[in-house]
Amino acid sequence: MPIDQKYEFQKPDALQAADLVRRAMVAWLQAGGTDLPTPASGFKLWKGLGYIVLHGTTGVLAVFRIRPDNLALRRMKRWPAGVEK
């Protein structure tokens, strides 16, 4: 069973969070996503890690983890259950 690790992650300001959400939406649409993300999409800090959660009308469309060193986004195949809430 994996051990939960906590990494130091600085919460982004409003402009950085908006840019990260925009980049996640672009990545979602370029990957072939057909549903459009809703305004409920946004930044989530979970157990010390930063995530961008894209919500759709039917639920969570995708979750992207934010690397703390260069703010690169990585799409998660399986995301933590607490990120959805």
Q: Where are the predicted features?
A:
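Extended aliphatic helical segments
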Residues: 21, 26, 53, 60-63, ...
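Exposed beta-strand-loop-beta-strand "reactive/processing" segments of non-cytosolic proteins
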Residues: 32-68, 72
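Short, non-transmembrane alpha-helical segments in secretory-pathway proteins
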Residues: 2-38
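Context-gated lysine
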Residues: 6, 11, 44-47, 77, ...
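A short, surface-exposed interaction/processing loop segment used at functional sites
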Residues: 65-85
